[in-house]
Amino acid sequence: MLTPQPQAKKLAQALGLKTGLYLKREDLHPHGSHKGRSIPVMIAMYSKLGWMNFCISSSGNAALAAIYAIKADKNLSLYIFVGRHIPKDKLEMLKLASGGNKKIIIEQVDRPKQTAFQMDKKGKAKNLRQSTDDSALIGYEALAGELAEIKNLAAVFIPTSSGAMAQGLYNGFKKHNLNPQIHIVQTPACHPFIDSPITGPSAANAIVDKIGLRKEGVLKTLKDSGGRGWIVFDEEIHDIKRKLFDINETELANISANSALSIAGLAQAIKNNWRFNGPVVCLITGR
C-alpha cells in the first residue's frame, strides 16, 4: 500500500458518523499529493511512445508530481509554465523541488495554459493536462485498489478540481466489482460540476478548474455511484480544523484547506441526513 489509510474513530464520533471513517493520506505520497498517482503514469506512458519533453501549466501539486517524476529519469525534460503573479512562496517551492535540475525549466508567462497547449500543438513537448487526457485516469485505479481493501466501503469524498480522480476511482472500483458512492467536494470559487448560483472566495486554492471539461463523465460517475456534489465554505473548513484540534489530532489539524475539503463535505452530508450503509473514506489530497 502506497499511502496509509487509518481509521479515524474520534473524528467520526465528532462528526456524528456511526458507520466508520477512514482518512486516505495522499498528502503522504512520495510525490507530495494525490497527483503522484496520475502524473508519473502519464509521463511513463508517453515516454514509451517516444516523448522526451513534457510541459505543464501548474503552480501546485501537479507541477510537484511532474518534477519528482522527471527527476527520476535523466533522459526527460520538463517545462513548467506559471503566471506572472504566482505567489512567491509557490514559486520558491517549485524551484526548491527541482533542485537546480537543468532539464526542469520554470517559466513565468502571461497565459500558462495557452503556452503549454501551443507547445504541445507544435510537437515540442507533451502537455500533461488532466482535465482532457484520459490517460490521467489510469493512475487513480491503483488508488481504488487500495481503498477496496476497506470492508464494506460505502462512500468516498473527494476534493475536486478537474474531476479526473473521481472518474479514475470510479473506473478502478468497477474493476473490483465495487460501487461505493462517489462524492465530489468543491468551493464557492470553483464548482463547474455543481449547478449552483453560489460564488465567493475560498481558502482551498487548489480547486481551480472552472471550465469543467469532464462534466459529462463526472456527472455520470455521481449518478451511477449514487453520490453527489457538495459546495463547502471556508467557515466549514475552519470548523473541521478546529474539531481536529479539539480531539487532539494535532497532525491532521495542520492539513491544508484543500485536504480538509473532503472532511467538510462529509460533515455537510451528515448534516443533510445523507445515509451510508458502511465505512466512509475522506481523501486527504495534499497542499
Question: Each predicted region: which residue ranges?
Answer:
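Active-site/ligand-binding loops adjacent to catalytic centers
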Residues: M93, D110-K124, K175-A257
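Alpha-helix C-terminal capping segments
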Residues: M42-G50, L64-N75, Y170-H176, A264-W274
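Short glycine/serine/threonine-rich phosphate/pyrophosphate-binding segments
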Residues: G36-P40, N53-Y68, K88-L91, L137, ...
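Positively charged, low-complexity intrinsically disordered leader regions
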Residues: M1-M52
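Phosphate-binding loop/pocket of nucleotide- and phosphate-handling active sites
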Residues: S196-A204, A260-R287
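Small/polar-residue-rich loop-to-helix segments that shape phosphate-bearing ligand pockets
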Residues: S77-A155, P201-L219, R228-W230
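A glycine-rich, Thr/Ser-enriched phosphate-binding loop motif common to dinucleotide/cofactor-binding enzymes
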Residues: D27-V41, L128-L147, N254-L261
